[in-house]
Design a protein with these regions (language model features):
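Glycine-rich, aromatic-flanked loop segments that form ligand/cofactor-binding clefts
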Residues: 133-147
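Conserved, mostly hydrophobic/aromatic
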Residues: 32, 56, 78, 110, ...
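Structured core elements
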Residues: 73-75, 96, 118, 139-141, ...
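Short acidic, glycine/serine/threonine-rich loops at helix termini
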Residues: 64, 86-87, 107-111, 128-131, ...
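A charged N-terminal "starter" segment
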Residues: 1-117, 122-136, 177-179, 183, ...
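Flexible loop/turn segments at secondary-structure boundaries
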Residues: 59-62, 103, 126, 147-148, ...
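Active-site loop/helix belt of alpha/beta enzymes
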Residues: 144-290
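Charged (often Lys/Glu-rich) extended helix/loop segments that serve as interaction or gating elements
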Residues: 260, 265-420
Length: 420
């Protein structure tokens, strides 16, 4: 079980809302830093370990700087993510660039920054050489095909995913890259998403460590690092058990000692890209109740919508909800909690048991620190909300203002009206 406790009180929420109107995404600096330190401690046995935070999860430079201060790098997948990371001071081996169907501009920018470039396809070897150049160190993304099983259950279906290369293609890519001047190599793979088990990373590590030994033997390539990518999830639901990062790190260490060390590859660095695990629990969407509707069901309408948090509408994903100030009240009312989009799937919760809710109540939607604001959009003319940092000293800082109508119309060149 995972107890879902907001990291702010109703009084704090009202204090922030007096300065920055709801809805807004709020991030907990203290929680972010403490979690980053736990991750680094869990993998401290590996001298080359580095967490590359997935920028796509939460692309905000203020948050990237916090993670940078805690020793993290960044995982980028687009030109603009590279630009944001560069602006934050990330360079060279602090950047992992993993992309697919990659434009030449993106590849060249990653090369110019000295990033570790992770190639998604065999044809990208020639593409890299043509449009950027072949660096000393290159990574290739592996897809084992088939299904990825853990215990008695299938975790995911890599064979149906568009990402990565087969083992034969990996070997061919390494051979071609060595001929073009590459000297060191990385292996990267992502086989399952949001796993809530301590066994996923160790199982994946075993697969990739054995692959590394085979590729080293078959091609002579020096394997510099193995990137376990993301996939370590969080307990969105209270009835789920949270992952134990210390146990996960220890499980990976055992596989490392069992497979790589006997093969003379004990100097291989371990990388991770845990966007969700690093930030999701340390972010929340704070929103105010605007309306109640009593028809065939009971509806609670809030000032946020799916444009602020897409996951429930897009995936049917569960996000826990707390009514601030009513944490100890009985959850004896059944509601659909809805936003104002002209779409019936704009619902943060369906048939959710909550305390009795009144207009003006402040609703705290948990675990939006990753894939929350970043997946926002402007459908229905909705404007993206502000982002706020709750600092370690209890003060708050606006780290992204809310969009305005001027922002929404900024790309039009049609009428002076839009410049108002």
């Amino acid at each position: 079980m995972t107890k879902k406790v907001p990291f702010i009180t109703l009084a704090q929420a009202k204090e922030i809302a007096a300065d920055i109107p709801t809805p807004f995404h709020l991030y907990d600096e203290k929680g972010i830093r403490e979690n980053a330190r736990r991750v680094n401690a869990a993998f401290s046995w590996n001298k080359g370990f580095k967490e590359y935070f997935a920028v796509k999860a939460t692309p905000n430079p203020y948050l990237l700087k916090i993670l940078q201060e805690e020793g993290c790098g960044v995982d980028c997948s687009s030109y603009t993510e590279l630009l944001m990371s560069e602006a934050c001071g990330f360079r060279g081996s602090d950047i992992m660039f993993s992309s697919n169907d990659t434009p030449a501009q993106d590849m060249k920018k990653a090369y110019d920054l000295g990033a570790y470039i992770n190639l998604d396809d065999l044809t990208h070897v020639e593409f890299l050489e043509k449009f950027a150049g072949v660096p000393k160190t290159v990574c290739c993304r592996y897809n084992p095909g088939g299904v990825f099983e853990l215990g008695n259950g299938i975790m995911d279906n890599p064979g149906d995913a568009k990402y990565g290369m087969s083992e034969d293609q990996m070997a061919e890519a390494y051979t071609k890259l060595m001929a073009a001047g590459a000297e060191e190599f990385g292996i990267h793979s992502f086989l399952a998403s949001n796993t809530v088990t301590d066994d996923y990373y160790p199982k994946l590590a075993g697969v990739l460590f054995e692959l590394a030994v085979r590729l080293h033997k078959s091609t002579g390539a020096k394997i510099k690092f193995i990137n376990l990518s993301g996939g370590v999830g969080i307990a969105y639901r209270p009835d789920q058990r949270s992952n134990d990062i210390a146990a996960i790190g220890e499980g990976v260490r055992k596989k490392f000692e069992e497979i790589l060390v006997p093969a003379g590859m004990g100097d291989v660095a371990i990388f991770t890209e845990m966007g969700r695990f690093m930030l999701a629990p340390y972010g929340a969407l704070v929103t105010t109740v605007l309306h109640q509707k009593h028809i065939y069901k009971e509806y609670i309408g809030v000032d946020a919508c799916a444009a602020n948090l897409m996951r429930p509408a897009m995936y049917g994903a569960y996000h826990h909800i707390t009514v601030l100030g009513k944490e100890d009240a009985p959850c004896d009312h059944k509601y659909d909690v809805t936003g104002g989009l002209c779409e019936n799937n704009d619902k943060f919760a369906i048939d959710r048991m909550l305390p009795e809710i009144e207009i003006g109540d402040v609703v705290y939607i948990h675990d939006t620190g990753a894939h929350g604001f970043s997946m926002g959009y402007n459908y229905n003319g909705k404007l993206r909300s502000a982002e706020v940092l709750l600092k370690e000293d209890g003060s708050h800082q606006l780290i992204r203002r809310a969009e305005t109508p001027a922002d929404y119309f900024a790309t039009f060149d049609f009428s002076p009206f839009f410049k108002k």
